[in-house]
Amino acid sequence: MGELQTHMQLQTDTIHEGVRKENWFAKAMNIKVGIIPLPVYALLFILITVFVMHHDVKSDILTSIAVMAFFGFTFAQIGKSIPIVRSIGGPAILATFIPSAVVYYHLLPNDIVKSTTEFTENSNFLYLFIAGIVVGSILGMKRETLVKAFMKIFIPLIVGSVTAAIVGLAVGTLLGLGFQHTLLYIVIPIMAGGVGEGAIPLSIGYSDIMPISQGEAFALVLPSIMLGSLCAIILAGLLNRIGKKKPEWTGNGKVDRSEEESPALEESQSGQQMFNLSLFASGGILAVSLYLVGMLAHDFFGFPAPVAMLLLAVLIKLFRLVPASIENGAFGVSRFFSTAVTYPLLFAIGVSMTPWDKLVAAFNLSNIITILSVVVTMMAVGFFTGKWLNMYPIETAIINACHSGQGGTGDVAILSAAERLELMPFAQVSTRIGGAITVSLTLLLLHQFY
């Protein structure tokens, strides 16, 4: 009897606890800037201010998380609050390019810039994000969809790239930029796969073949990459808006029309599995391990680490090498990164990897029109080719947009603007494989005919 009374008392206490009135502080905790409760946001502001005043902003993981979360979600929230801007990927644009501008104009404390840059460069933070998103997205797909989508996606990518190159060359030449300049310093760089795997090998190759220094070539190549990426981000945001008005054109992250329900739960024995912390951790370790294998592939064979990781994840999915429970855990990791890490990462990218002066250097009318013609053509061809192949046209257009982005950093920004980070595996194919083919063919042909 005593045990029954105790049990009933506990139930009563629980009910009272559930219906208790919230005080003003608890209510304030429900107001958020991004995912940060307002009181915590205010505390972070005070802490960061104190650290800056004492020149004590460290580049360790704890301080870096606080700094990047504070600024990343601040700029994203501003982007979400501006009516027109939020419709064209405003949160991603502001979280990336405003930090770049404030660094260039020395409006951000140097201690913040230094700590963020050191953490980003030394921690491989970007590739941890890509590993979590790519592996989780692939393991969350249906096997049949995975095969169909990867087989089909090369068609709009190839057709879009060739058509965009032709249109870009025609537009640039007509605007007086010259055939050679348009091809080598505008069209090819846009599709080269970013800075590390595009601009740098291109500029080295140009300097070996033509009478130009590597530094001069790099300075000519980089602005087109930056502006091309910005155009792709804005257009991806517009496509997201169009998709909300024309739902029949989009799979909301699914690529092939044969894909039906949420892929991550296709073989789940229980909806609770995704939230099992042990499985979540297993999925995260799997993603990290696959990326490390990719790094070895790069060291021994020169194969891009993200592509090797992607191929391994595809093989694991195709041959069912891990149980469905761990697949769901990996999918949970990708959801965590897309929800909590995207905007802090974009802030870090803006501070440490996006030179504002190079972006501004491309801002003349002829360059803008030519670059825009390349990106628009690539996305438009992706849209209509995808539709013809019975794929979701908005998704195929967004994947094609990643071929005109800033490499891995551009993929994150473009897919964030489009609100489709689950397309990261296809974006990596578009960026890494498409970029490598573009650079290799360009230098091979240039060597033969220059």
From Swiss-Prot:
Pfam families: 2HCT (PF03390)
Impact noted for substituting residue 402 to S: Retains 55% of specific activity for citrate transport. Retains 52% of specific activity for citrate transport
GO molecular function: citrate:proton symporter activity
Bilayer topology: Multi-pass membrane protein
Domain of life: Bacteria
Keyword Magnesium: no
Effect of residue 432 to C: Loss of citrate uptake activity
Catalytic activity, reaction form: citrate(in) + 3 H(+)(in) = citrate(out) + 3 H(+)(out); (S)-malate(in) + 2 H(+)(in) = (S)-malate(out) + 2 H(+)(out)
Positions on the Extracellular side per record topology: 54-64, 109-118, 174-217, 295, 357-364, 447-450
Keyword annotations of the record: Cell membrane, Citrate utilization, Membrane, Symport, Transmembrane, Transmembrane helix, Transport
Stretches that traverse the bilayer: 33-53, 65-85, 88-108, 119-139, 153-173, 218-238, 274-294, 296-316, 336-356, 365-385, 429-446
Record topology, Cytoplasmic segments: 1-32, 86-87, 140-152, 239-273, 317-335, 386-428
Cellular component terms (Gene Ontology): plasma membrane
Activity modulation comment: The uptake activity is inhibited by divalent metal ions such as Ca(2+), Mg(2+) and Ni(2+).
Region (Disordered): 249-268
InterPro entries cross-referenced by the UniProt entry: 2-OHcarbox_trans_Prot/Firm (IPR018025), 2-OHcarboxylate_transport (IPR004679)
Single biological process term from Gene Ontology: citrate metabolic process
Role summary: Proton motive force-driven secondary transporter that catalyzes the uptake of both citrate and malate. Is an electroneutral proton-solute symporter: the number of protons transported is equal to the valence of the transported anions. Translocates the free citrate and malate anions. Citramalate binds to the transporter, but it is not translocated. Is strictly stereoselective, recognizing only the (S)-enantiomers of malate and citramalate.
Family assignment from sequence similarity: Belongs to the 2-hydroxycarboxylate transporter (2-HCT) (TC 2.A.24) family.
Name used for this protein in its record: Citrate/malate-proton symporter
Biological source species: Bacillus subtilis (strain 168)
Lineage of the organism: Bacteria, Bacillati, Bacillota, Bacilli, Bacillales
